[in-house]
Amino acid sequence: MLRIRTTLLVLVLIHAPLGGCSDADVRPRSAPGEDPSAPELAVEVTDSAGIVHRRSPAAALRRTAYEVAPEAHVVIDGTEGGGQPLHAVGAVAFGPEGTLAIAERGEMGVRRHDMTGARLSVVGRDGQGPGEFGALNGLGFRADSMFVFDSRWSRISVFGPAGEYVRQVVPESAAGDRPRWFAFDPEVGILTTSRGAEGDLGWGLHGFDGESIASFPDAPSPANPKMGLVGASGETPPVRLFQAQPVAGLWNGGLVATSADRYRLELHDRSGVLREIWSVADTLPRRVTDDDVDAARRRAIAATDPDARPAVERRWSDVETPGRFPAFGASSGIIFIDPPQIVAASHGDDHELWIRAYPADPGVGPRWWVFRADGTVLGSVEFPARFELHAVSEAGAVGVLEDEFEVQRVVVYALDPAGVESRARASAGG
């Protein structure tokens, strides 16, 4: 039986070494003159001094960790109980006692449903007052209290178990601006971004009353030059193709964030000190081809109003592309979308981390890599196309499924962990 306790983190990676076989069986990609049959290197884990502690092969990432049921066993379209259809879902989370919470910007409230899909209640409405929202972008639960992030008013509203408004939390900002982004861990705290006086964007960790716990000035952040996300100067900056979004999250009591090339992740403790680095071999993600660029150009022009297409075509005269696709994260190809998610879960006594692989091939369903806390690579999970994962629990995987007409539904897919359990027994000698 699958038993997973989950925490939704908005954005990125693990704290432990990755492994699918022993160190003796794994070598870096072969150099000239070496055995070409040596396993292809996937991940190399080092400490802050650069000392390698574990290497993992690519094959471990290619096996299936969980089978996803062909049909969702919970489907919510928003019309249950006389409600309006779902529109612009900002966040979905599993709540206590077998419930689901859906932060939805169309109705500007948080809907609560049971696992049959029946609508139980709605909290909040459009406005600026207590318990009202301007833009819903994040959800989190701590015991039976619900934390809801409003990016427009840069605040967090806390609701009790009966849906009653309790209080407002405004995270303190050492960077000189109010928070703009939200990640929640019921055991660690609240992670936000805020923009400083010079325009730099940094990460801040806060307690559940908004008090500042730590800042991470040396961690990669969206406006940090290490990220390479700032366009060239001039009226028409180059089109930045296939760039992964800034990725960071709370896990194992600290912050994990990416560096510039998207093949490297840094783990910082609660005090901001860099403890470990994961380097993903740049031999793994496939190269960007001329066909990839041409296809992205065609999609951009087709999605543009005919009157505006000449301007789009002029902008596409200057295109910047990386040599290879990023290893993980998400991107719309041209326009940055909401940050990709990181899902942390527990399976029995093991903690897992799910990381989204970069969607290099259009039309292929989103793929997630799954790791145990000790770094063992369970494998990957592939979901249907147009499905965005938000959380994992014993009930399955919940997220937003959008059809070709952009109609949204919140769905839950069952997960079959039989392969994971059999591998665990085999590794234990059972």
Please give the residue ranges for each predicted region.
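Eukaryotic scaffold repeat domains enriched in small/polar residues
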Residues: 21-430
